[in-house]
Amino acid sequence: MASRCSEPYPEVSRIPTVRGCNGSLSGALSCCEDSARGSGPPKAPTVAEGPSSCLRRNVISERERRKRMSLSCERLRALLPQFDGRREDMASVLEMSVQFLRLASALGPSQEQHAILASSKEMWHSLQEDVLQLTLSSQIQAGVPDPGTGASSGTRTPDVKAFLESPWSLDPASASPEPVPHILASSRQWDPASCTSLGTDKCEALLGLCQVRGGLPPFSEPSSLVPWPPGRSLPKAVRPPLSWPPFSQQQTLPVMSGEALGWLGQAGPLAMGAAPLGEPAKEDPMLAQEAGSALGSDVDDGTSFLLTAGPSSWPGEWGPGFRAGPPA
């Protein structure tokens, strides 16, 4: 027996010893571990631990997933409306959530309506900015002080360079209601000497714009006598528009105010002498001179003609053949 155990086939001699270890699987494994300690690390336990570790991980992840689902269902139950006969199981809660979302999307605005509302808001903001810019520009042109800075010491002067670089349209039909000369006159007094500092080209352009837009404003006394550039001639100084149009542009029967009728009632009987009714009345030179001096430079407008002439010289139905009587 000793010679057989010393043979180089130890597996055959180990088989009965393995079978003799308690006769069970656990005993066989323990015996195998004891026999394999000297040869190296055991490989059988590592094979047995692999599937068990993966199984434990799957169980843990499944438990976490179920916890999340139950928590979400509890939140949905609290958010959904309460009514009689509502089911509280998980499937019913999910179905009610889907139906509620469909109803909300049908009643609420869609994505296209959201885009339309956003674009309309942007247009409204841009319109408000445009109105604000127009208001500020009109205040600057009219010389109104800014509300934030309080009352300014003087009117604000517009930038002539910016005005020349971007002038308004030269078409009178598309022109703004306020002409350029009035804007310039309200911002500062017109001084011909200021054109020399601007240059001949800019001065010519500015004068051309003023002529198109209604003529130059009345010139004030220049601060310094600066000679006008050679070769240039000032346009005719246009005086402020008369309150009465010229006599050639008046109607045949001019409309007179109450004050003019009062003057006529006072001057008419005194200006006429004891002439017959059919003959023209003679004019008193003293009364004519007083009327002319009272009116000043309005002689060209025809006002003195109305105040000094008698009724016999009026054209139309107020002529010599007029007879006062009740209307027919």
UniProtKB/Swiss-Prot annotation:
CDD domains from the UniProt entry: bHLH_SOHLH1_2
Subcellular location field: Cytoplasm; Nucleus
UniProt keywords, alphabetically: Cytoplasm, Developmental protein, Differentiation, Disease variant, DNA-binding, Nucleus, Spermatogenesis, Transcription, Transcription regulation
Major location category of this protein: cytoplasm
GO biological process assignments: cell differentiation; oocyte differentiation; spermatogenesis
Any Gene Ontology CC annotation: chromatin
Chain segments carrying region Disordered: 290-328
GO MF term set: DNA-binding transcription factor activity, RNA polymerase II-specific; protein heterodimerization activity; protein homodimerization activity; transcription cis-regulatory region binding
Domain bHLH: start-end pairs: 53-104
Biased composition (Low complexity): 310-321
Role: Transcription regulator of both male and female germline differentiation. Suppresses genes involved in spermatogonial stem cells maintenance, and induces genes important for spermatogonial differentiation. Coordinates oocyte differentiation without affecting meiosis I.
Disease in which the protein is involved: Spermatogenic failure 32: An autosomal dominant infertility disorder caused by spermatogenesis defects that result in non-obstructive azoospermia. Ovarian dysgenesis 5: A disorder characterized by lack of spontaneous pubertal development, primary amenorrhea, uterine hypoplasia, and hypergonadotropic hypogonadism as a result of streak gonads. ODG5 is an autosomal recessive condition.
SUBUNIT field: Forms both hetero- and homodimers with SOHLH2.
Name of the featured protein: Spermatogenesis- and oogenesis-specific basic helix-loop-helix-containing protein 1
